Amino acid sequence: MCRHLGWLGAQVAVSSLVLDPPQGLRVQSYAPRRQKHGLMNADGWGVGFFDGAIPRRWRSPAPLWGDTSFHSVAPALRSHCILAAVRSATVGMPIEVSATPPFTDGHWLLAHNGVVDRAVLPAGPAAESVCDSAILAATIFAHGLDALGDTIVKVGAADPNARLNILAANGSRLIATTWGDTLSILRRADGVVLASEPYDDDSGWGDVPDRHLVEVTQKGVTLTALDRAKGPR
C-alpha cells in the first residue's frame, strides 16, 4: 500500500507538490487522512520526474519525513511531469530501494497503491524487486500502458482480493486506475494533479469513482469505466 501523486502541466518544483502542501506526501507518510489499509507510510519514498523525455528517480527505503537531504534539494528539482509516492510495505515484502516506487522501464514511471497475490503474476527478470508491486509493474510494462485497463481487469479477475490503484507517467501522459482504493483529481490553472488523497482542502478536489481509468494529457482528462458495461464517461 502507499500514497501516490502525479502532476502534468507547467514546470513546478517537486517540493511544491510533495513537501509544502499542508497534507502533502510528507505528512501522508505519517498521518494519512483517507488511507483504507495501514496506518502510515514509513517504508520508503520515491520521486520521479521527467528531464525532457528522460525519467529520473530519487528513492529511499527510509521514511520521507526524516530525509533532510531531499528536503534541501527538492525546491531545485523542477519538471512538467512528476510522480511521487510514499510506501507502506505489504506484509512479508522487502523494505529496500528496489522495492520502492516509482518503478520504470526507461520510458514510464509507475507506482502501485494496493496489494496483489504474486502467484497470479508472471515471474520474470524484468521486475526490479521480488515485491508484489514491482512484479505487477513489470507485467504492466510488458503489456504496454495503452493496455493498462485490460491488464488491471485481468489481474483483478485472477485475484479477487487485489487492490490495484496504478499511477503512471511518461512525460506527456498521466494514467491511473482505481481498483479498491481512493484517488482524487485537482484541475488547476497550470496543470492537473492525481493523488491518492487531497494534499489540501481546496474545494476543487474531486473523487474518481472506483474501477475507473483516468488519462490526463494536454488535451484534457478522460475517465473510462473499467467495467465494460458502464462504457466511457
From Swiss-Prot:
Lineage: Bacteria, Bacillati, Actinomycetota, Actinomycetes, Mycobacteriales
Keyword Hydrolase attributed: yes
Biological pathway: Amino-acid biosynthesis; ergothioneine biosynthesis
Name of the featured protein: Gamma-glutamyl-hercynylcysteine sulfoxide hydrolase
KW Cytoplasm (keyword) present: no
Role according to the record: Catalyzes the hydrolysis of the gamma-glutamyl amide bond of hercynyl-gamma-L-glutamyl-L-cysteine sulfoxide to produce hercynylcysteine sulfoxide, a step in the biosynthesis pathway of ergothioneine. Ergothioneine is an antioxidant that protects mycobacteria from oxidative stress.
Reaction(s) this enzyme catalyzes, per UniProt: gamma-L-glutamyl-hercynylcysteine S-oxide + H2O = S-(hercyn-2-yl)-L-cysteine S-oxide + L-glutamate
Active site: 2 (nucleophile)
